[in-house]
Amino acid sequence: WLSNEKWERFKELNVSLDGKNILDVGSGNGYYAFRMLGEGASKILCLEPNLMHVSQFLAINKMMSSESIRMVPERLEDMALKTTTFDIVFSMGLLYHQRNPSKHINDLKEMVKEGGKLIIETIILPDECGLFLEPDLSRYASMPNVHFVHSDIGCKTLFEESKLFLRNESVAIKTTNQEQRKTKWMPFKSFESALNPKNNNETIEGYPAPKRKFYVLEK
């Protein structure tokens, strides 16, 4: 992934991170946490259960020597965190992997202070697909463990049910094989192989090709 492209899309939403206490759920190797730090965040707690990603973070932070970012190798649902602790909570690229999307949204909401923000970034489908799609065999665009892919209206319905207020949203951006591509460090199958070779508006499974979108929500 060219992770900087996603970050630039977030920055267009003009959400101030200056002085904020942030929770980044499913943070990968911590790339976005370091970008948050660069935007003036005070403290960032990263939750990432994948130990390879945790190892990458530790290697990066060995050079960065930041005491403002901590990473814990746990899932949100397994943590006994104090609720209403964070000014901003991020969930990027997680919603479609949830067996219970409503619970995920509510678990995130519990971590946000009153008046704080929840940032959701996810794949969305066209509204004509209904509120959500349940992919056969839980596979979508060659990704395993994809249980629900929501439309824009489906996402907004989830947020309304959780009594979250939509304050801003990005445009929906189609994922390209320039943003997610093979490199000499990652020579395996990538996004290009996830699309129908005869119609790049469809996934290899025949579903609408993914677009990604940010939502800025307030508690």
Residue ranges of each PLM-predicted region?
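A short SAM/SAH-binding and catalytic strip from SAM-dependent methyltransferases
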Residues: 87-101
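A short glycine-rich, Lys/Arg-flanked "PGG" loop and its adjoining helix->strand segment in the class I
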Residues: 102-117
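Short alpha-helix
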Residues: 147-163
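Short, glycine-/aromatic-enriched active-site segment of Class I SAM-dependent methyltransferases
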Residues: 123-146
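Conserved class I S-adenosyl-L-methionine
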Residues: 20-28
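Conserved catalytic loop of SAM-dependent methyltransferase domains
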Residues: 163-193
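Conserved SAM-binding loop of SAM-dependent methyltransferases across substrates and taxa
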Residues: 29-40
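A short acidic, Gly/Pro-enriched loop at the edge of an enzyme's catalytic core
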Residues: 79-89
